[in-house]
Amino acid sequence: MERKIDMKDLEDIEQLLINVDMVNGFVKHGAMADEYIMHIVPEHLKLMNDIVKKGEAIAIIKDTHKENCREFDRFPTHCVEGTEESELIEELKKYENDALVYCKNSTSTMYAPRFI
């Protein structure tokens, strides 16, 4: 789901917390997962709570690949669209409905639809 924000809302935003790749496939399980990342989750939650309390914005960027993604020529198959790996970790899901959400099919967020 995406949060609908118009240009007036964007002009009122003073802070934007960008959350990148905190998905199950990088944090909890799968070929690209590194469970050590979990050690930053408590601080991440604190930052997200602070931003929400201030009425500021959160952007969530999720690694979400098509099954035939060219990236899989260089990296193991991971975070395929529609799988649990491509979902935000449970600890952060409560923010997803109120965030700007972008799904990227490459290593670069710049190629995510509607990002720029």
Question: Where does each model-flagged region fall?
Answer:
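Active-site acidic carboxylates
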Residues: 1-105
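Alpha-helical scaffold elements lining the catalytic groove of polysaccharide deacetylases
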Residues: 104-116
